[in-house]
Structures are given as structure tokens and as C-alpha cells.
């Protein structure tokens, strides 16, 4: 018999339910998590044995959305879900980041978490539900895991924090922040903000962490009722004798190598030390495990670097804790791009471009809740050469998608709206060198490239990555961390913003015990660093250029009556297609009659606008037009009278005398003055040649085209 065990509780304005014991009973653990009508089914499977030779923790998180959850069919020829979307990839990372640090060091068994969205309320995002479901499933599984964690979304509306705001509320919120953590500590923050202060951002983190305690309490109660026995796993004992021998051979040499400031030279020195130690020890005793020696060397390397920082000694590259690496800022570095910048900070460098396009260049995104259009794209590329390595080059990996999204969050708050700047904008960041915080270099480069392209952003933005080394109550916050400091430290804390406030905050913490004080110190130190970087950037370009690039399309906007839209488009799009070919422009028409004409040549744009005005001009009864014969039929002839409009001259209106054969009087392409006699209810135009030739007629004769 199926005996579901259920926990139900109020979470902000929503009802949250956790249910286990009904489905996927062959998985290590499974939970159906739901918030209102949004439900995510989460499974966890853990391998009982680690793979032989495994040297890292193989945790895989897959978040997947099923279109049936929204009562829809998938798009595409096969009508089936395919590769993960960018949104699914980002939420997979969102689940992974707070749970990964909670597995014990040395645990190398494969763990696979799958979160499947099976029902969706358009007002309730599935990401928070999936994070809580993954936490509950891992806690139930018995796998070594120092959870559970809670997760919460925090908005900021009318100067008040809002727990788990709906999609409608987020539209008016100045903040979209996701925070996850255990009972005692924050582990992960992901956010974008509308230029909030550091205190407001920190307040949101603390508020979200406080509110999610009810989630942790309910997961603990569910585990007490339905949890599986804890795995009998023990970390491998450290060989103290081997540890001492490795320290004797390597400690002082590693300390010296970490005084080498150039990255590749330092890496070569460290690799040589490790190779020497392995060779020396295995030469004395062939039974020693090379993997164990390397693990001890890695731990020793970490200890050497951290101890130096905590003692207040200079950092790896000789800087003090709050110093920023040397900056080099250049704009307009590529001649034919619409905007470009080269931003260099120490050994991290980003070549960033901005490209302007029309509305049809915008990205149409098909989501569970329906389609939406994105007018601002930011893509981040991290080729292997930027770290001096060889490797595969192809479609973007999870890391590139995640870093691109973070950089986009950092810039989004200062982008102009469509009414101010009717362009689609694509920013691409090519990381050409990397030694820490390439995503924040992308934020700086994006701001510079956008200003170089003439995009009227509200303010310049810059980003900085902070780090932390903490032992007991002793801690040091580091500004502008290197890649090694990120790897060997306890926190990666990225902040982007303008002089006015914060636009994005991302935090990943590897240890418990990060206090309110530490986060406050990090935010304040980051603000000082951001102001320094903005000062250097402003010396290169202080405001957006007054004009867009000569190679970018100029968008001209006119308004026509909405009942004239069909005339400009024509049957099957024939008129607008002919217009774009004739004028060499791009023409877009909105439902309210707004017409956008885009062209790199101003004369072409003006020509297109003039043609549209002719097409949409009202035909005046009694007015004489210069018509051109387009068709000859037995009962008369059809004339083009300008603006794509056509009228009929009946055979009786060709001449003052009786006409037996139209072709005796008219031929195709002939231009003749015609007078408008009538426009009927269906828009059909009656014309006359004989009335136009009467001596009393006015000589108002526009050219037909």
C-alpha cells in the first residue's frame, strides 16, 4: 500500500506542501514539493560505493521543466522536450550551489538530483520549490549531508521586504533576491536590484534567512517521521606520518612559490614542487598512493596561502587585503562594431562588444508560463586560451551561461526602456585572460561598450569580487580576488553597481559561521573598490556618446492610423515586402500604429517614411492624381494613383465620345491625369479621365509610384 507522509505549512502568502512515500520508491529518496499549484517532483539517488580513482565529488543536479505542467505542447518538429533551456540550466546551478558545500570532505560517491516541474501556477516560480524539494529529498535519503537548507525569494516593494512575491508583484519590485542557507548560516545569494543601498541588500539577505527557518523546521519533522537510516560512511583517516613527510619536503618551497606574482610562472613552480615530492616519496616506497600524496599536497597548499593572509602578510600577488589590481580601460577598440571596450584588471581581461538591432532581433523565449521577448542579451564566452589551456570549443557550458546571467543582472538596472531607446541590444564578453572575477570584468566592459555604442544607460556600472579567509574568530576580507584566492578561500562574494547603489549581488559561501558583521565588512569594502573602478572607467568615457555608430541602424518612428496598418502590410505582406526591398530598410509595425523604420542610411529611411505616408494618405474625392495604367480589362483600366492605391477608370469615363476598345486609348505603364469620383464603403476607388481633362480642374497632381 502507498502511504504518503505529508507536511503542510504556511510560507509567506503561500501554502507549502512536502510529500514523500508515494512515488519513485526505488530512488534513494523522492519528494513532491508544491507551493500553491506549482509542484516539483525531486528525486535523489546516491551510489553506495565511490568509483575507483575518483578524485572529486561527482554531484549532478538536473532541473527540467515539462510543458504539460502548464497544459501546453512543446514546440519544435518532434513536439518533445529537448536539451535544457538557459533558464533550466540557471536553476540547476541555483540548486547545486547551496547544497554542494554540505557534503563532507572526502565523500566521493556519485549523487544525482533530478527536479522535474510537473505543475505550474504562472504566479509562482518553480525555482524556490525545486530548491526546497532537493533539500528535503537529500535530508530524507540518509546520504551524508549537513542540511537541510531553506530557500526564499525576497522582493522590495514600497520600501518593505516581501517574502516569495508573485510574478505580478515582482514586476513592481526593486529587488529580486534568492537566499538559501542552513539553520545557522547563509550559504548562497543570487540577486538583481534597482540600485539599492548596501544596507538594504544586507537587510534582504537577513530577512530571507530568518523567514526560511520554517522550511528547515518542517523538513526536520518530515525526516523524523520518514527519513531513511544514515549511511555508515567514515572519512578516510589521514596518514599522519605521510602528512609530516610531505610537509617537510614541500611546505617552505610552496611558501616561496606563492610569492611569485605571475600566474603561469607560479603554477609551473607549484607543479614542479608537487612532481618532485611525488617522485621522492614513491621512490622511497612504491606502495604509497599517489592520489593520497596529491590530496595532502593540496591541503598543505591551501594552509600555506590561508596562514599568510591571516597573519596579515601580502597576498599572492603582493597586494594588501583591500587593494585592486592595476586597471587598463579602453573604448572603441574595434573599428566596425557598434560599440567596444577592452577592460583589463591585472591578469583578467575582457573584450566586450555592443551590437544594436531592431525589434525583430529580440529573442523570443518560450517558457512554461508562455512566450516573452527579451530586448537585452548578454553573452559570456570563456575560451580555453584565456587560462593558457587547450580544450573543446563549442556551445556554452553551464558556467558560461551562469556568468553571463550574472553580468546581465549587473547591467540590467541601468538599461533604457523601449520608449527611450527602441533598439534590441546584444553585448558579448570575450574573456581573453582570466585570473579571477571575469564575470565582474564583463560587467565593467559591458558598461563601457554600451556607452561607446551610444546607448543612453542611466549610469556607469562596475563589478568586484570579494573573498574571505576565516579561521575561528579571525577573518580577513579580500578585495578583487585572484582565481587561487577564490579556490583556497571560504567565500566568493560578487557585487555590481553604480555610484548610486547595487544592481547585482551573488554570494557563495563554503563554510558556516559567516556573520552579519562579516557580510557588512565585505559589502562596505566592495563599495570602496567599486567607486575606485568607476573612477578609472570614467576617465576613459564618462557618459554615453551623443550619436550611435555610423554602422548601426538608425530607427525612425512615425505613427499611422491603426486602420491603415493593413494598407502598409498588404495582402500576404506584399506591400511591406516590396517597400523593404525598394528602400533597403527594415520596417516594423506595432498594433497601435507605431511604425519603426531602421536603416544605416538616413536617405533610405526618409524615402521609406515618405512612401509609407503616401500609402496611408487619405484619398480625396474630387482631387486629380497622376495615375499610371497597371491593368487593362474589357470594361476599363486600373490605375495606380500613388501610395500603393489603385482605382478603376470605367470605359465610359475614358473619353467624351464612345470608346469601343480600351486598348485604342490606353497602354500599360502610360501616365494620365485621373480624377477621384468616389471611394465606396469597401474602399474601392472610381476614377475618371474625362473629368480630369475638363478645363476647370485644379492642377494638384502627385506622382504615382
Swiss-Prot record:
Ranges for the S1 motif domain?
Answer: 622-690
Q: Which UniProt keywords apply?
A: Cytoplasm, Magnesium, Metal-binding, Nucleotidyltransferase, RNA-binding, Transferase
> Where does this polypeptide localize?
Cytoplasm
Q: Which CDD domains match?
A: KH-I_PNPase (cd02393), RNase_PH_PNPase_1 (cd11363), RNase_PH_PNPase_2 (cd11364), S1_PNPase (cd04472)
Listed PROSITE patterns = KH_TYPE_1, S1
Needed co-factor(s): Mg(2+)
Reactions it catalyzes: RNA(n+1) + phosphate = RNA(n) + a ribonucleoside 5'-diphosphate
Which InterPro entries does the entry link to?
ExoRNase_PH_dom1, ExoRNase_PH_dom2, ExoRNase_PH_dom2_sf, KH_dom, KH_dom_type_1, KH_dom_type_1_sf, NA-bd_OB-fold, PNPase
- EC assignment: 2.7.7.8
Biological processes, Gene Ontology terms: mRNA catabolic process; RNA processing
Q: Which NCBIfam families match?
A: polynuc_phos, PRK11824.1
HAMAP family per record: PNPase
Q: Which family does it belong to?
A: Belongs to the polyribonucleotide nucleotidyltransferase family.
Subunit structure, per the record? Component of the RNA degradosome, which is a multiprotein complex involved in RNA processing and mRNA degradation.
Q: What is this protein called?
A: Polyribonucleotide nucleotidyltransferase
Species annotation: Sodalis glossinidius (strain morsitans)
Amino acid at each position: 500500500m502507498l502511504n504518503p507522509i505529508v507536511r503542510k505549512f504556511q510560507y509567506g502568502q503561500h501554502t507549502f506542501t512536502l510529500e514523500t512515500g508515494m512515488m519513485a520508491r526505488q530512488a534513494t529518496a523522492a519528494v513532491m514539493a508544491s507551493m500553491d499549484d506549482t509542484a516539483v517532483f525531486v528525486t535523489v539517488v546516491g551510489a553506495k560505493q565511490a568509483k575507483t580513482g575518483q578524485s572529486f565529488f561527482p554531484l549532478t543536479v538536473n532541473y527540467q521543466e515539462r510543458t504539460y505542467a502548464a497544459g501546453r505542447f512543446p514546440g519544435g518538429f518532434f513536439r518533445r522536450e529537448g536539451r535544457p533551456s538557459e533558464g533550466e540550466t540557471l536553476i540547476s546551478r541555483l540548486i547545486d550551489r547551496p547544497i554542494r558545500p554540505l557534503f563532507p570532505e572526502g565523500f566521493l560517491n556519485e549523487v544525482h538530483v533530478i527536479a522535474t516541474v510537473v505543475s505550474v501556477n504562472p504566479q509562482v516560480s518553480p525555482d524556490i520549490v525545486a530548491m526546497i524539494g532537493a533539500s528535503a529529498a537529500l535530508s530524507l535519503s540518509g546520504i551524508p549531508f549537513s542540511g537541510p537548507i531553506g530557500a526564499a525569494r525576497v522582493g522590495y516593494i514600497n520600501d518593505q521586504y516581501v517574502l516569495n512575491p508573485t510574478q505580478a508583484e515582482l514586476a513592481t519590485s526593486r529587488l529580486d533576491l534568492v537566499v538559501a542557507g542552513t539553520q545557522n548560516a547563509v550559504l548562497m545569494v543570487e540577486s538583481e536590484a534597482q540600485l539599492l543601498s548596501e544596507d538594504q541588500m544586507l537587510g534582504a539577505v537577513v530577512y530571507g534567512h530568518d523567514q526560511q527557518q520554517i522550511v528547515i523546521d518542517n523538513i526536520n519533522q518530515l525526516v523524523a517521521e520518514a527519513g531513511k537510516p544514515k549511511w555508515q560512511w567514515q572519512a578516510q583517516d589521514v596518514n599522519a606520518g605521510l602528512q609530516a613527510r610531505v610537509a617537510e619536503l614541500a611546505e617552505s618551497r610552496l611558501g616561496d612559490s606563492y610569492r611569485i606574482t605571475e600566474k603561469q610562472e607560479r603554477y609551473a613552480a607549484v607543479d614542479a614542487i608537487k612532481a618532485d615530492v611525488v617522485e621522492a616519496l614513491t621512490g622511497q616506497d612504491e606502495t604509497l598512493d599517489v592520489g593520497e600524496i596529491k590530496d595532502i599536497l593540496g591541503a598543505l597548499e591551501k594552509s600555506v596561502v590561508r596562514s599568510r593572509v591571516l597573519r596579515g602578510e601580502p597576498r599572492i600577488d603582493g597586494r594588501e587585503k583591500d587593494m585592486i589590481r592595476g586597471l587598463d580601460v579602453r573604448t572603441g577598440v574595434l573599428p566596425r562594431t557598434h560599440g567596444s571596450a577592452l577592460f583589463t584588471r591585472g591578469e583578467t581581461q575582457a573584450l566586450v562588444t555592443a551590437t544594436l538591432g531592431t525589434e525583430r532581433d529580440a529573442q523570443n523565449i518560450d517558457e512554461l508560463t508562455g512566450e516573452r521577448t527579451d530586448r537585452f542579451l548578454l553573452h559570456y564566452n570563456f575560451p580555453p586560451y584565456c587560462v593558457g589551456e587547450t580544450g573543446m570549443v563549442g556551445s556554452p557550458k553551464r558556467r558560461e551561461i551562469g556568468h553571463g546571467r550574472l553580468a546581465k543582472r549587473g547591467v540590467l538596472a541601468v538599461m533604457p526602456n523601449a520608449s527611450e531607446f527602441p533598439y534590441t541590444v546584444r553585448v558579448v564578453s570575450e574573456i581573453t585572460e582570466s585570473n579571477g572575477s571575469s564575470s565582474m570584468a564583463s560587467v565593467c566592459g559591458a558598461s563601457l561598450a554600451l556607452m561607446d555604442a551610444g546607448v543612453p544607460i542611466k549610469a556607469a556600472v562596475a563589478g568586484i569580487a570579494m573573498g574571505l579567509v576565516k579561521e575561528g574568530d579571525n577573518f580577513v576580507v579580500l578585495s578583487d580576488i585572484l582565481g587561487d584566492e577564490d579556490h583556497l578561500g571560504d567565500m566568493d562574494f560578487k557585487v555590481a553597481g553604480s555610484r548610486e547603489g547595487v544592481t547585482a549581488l551573488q554570494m557563495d559561501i563554503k563554510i558556516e559561521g559567516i556573520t552579519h558583521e562579516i557580510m557588512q565588512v565585505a559589502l562596505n569594502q566592495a563599495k570602496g573598490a567599486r567607486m575606485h573602478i568607476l573612477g578609472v572607467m570614467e576617465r576613459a568615457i564618462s557618459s554615453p556618446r551623443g550619436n550611435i555608430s555610423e554602422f548601426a541602424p538608425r530607427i525612425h518612428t512615425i505613427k499611422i492610423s491603426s486602420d491603415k496598418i493593413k494598407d502598409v502590410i498588404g495582402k500576404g505582406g506584399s506591400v511591406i515586402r516590396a517597400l523593404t526591398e525598394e528602400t533597403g530598410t527594415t520596417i516594423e509595425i506595432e498594433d497601435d500604429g507605431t511604425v519603426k523604420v531602421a536603416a544605416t542610411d538616413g536617405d533610405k529611411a526618409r524615402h521609406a517614411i515618405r512612401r509609407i505616408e503616401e500609402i496611408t494618405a487619405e484619398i480625396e474625392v474630387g482631387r486629380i492624381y497622376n495615375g499610371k495604367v497597371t491593368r487593362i480589362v474589357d470594361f476599363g483600366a486600373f490605375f495606380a494613383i500613388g501610395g500603393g492605391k489603385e482605382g478603376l477608370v470605367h470605359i465610359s469615363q475614358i473619353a467624351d465620345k464612345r470608346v469601343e476598345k480600351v486598348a485604342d486609348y490606353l497602354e500599360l505603364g502610360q501616365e494620365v491625369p485621373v480624377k477621384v469620383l468616389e471611394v465606396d464603403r469597401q474602399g474601392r476607388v472610381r476614377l475618371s479621365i474625362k473629368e480630369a481633362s475638363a478645363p476647370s480642374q485644379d492642377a494638384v497632381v502627385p506622382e504615382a509610384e
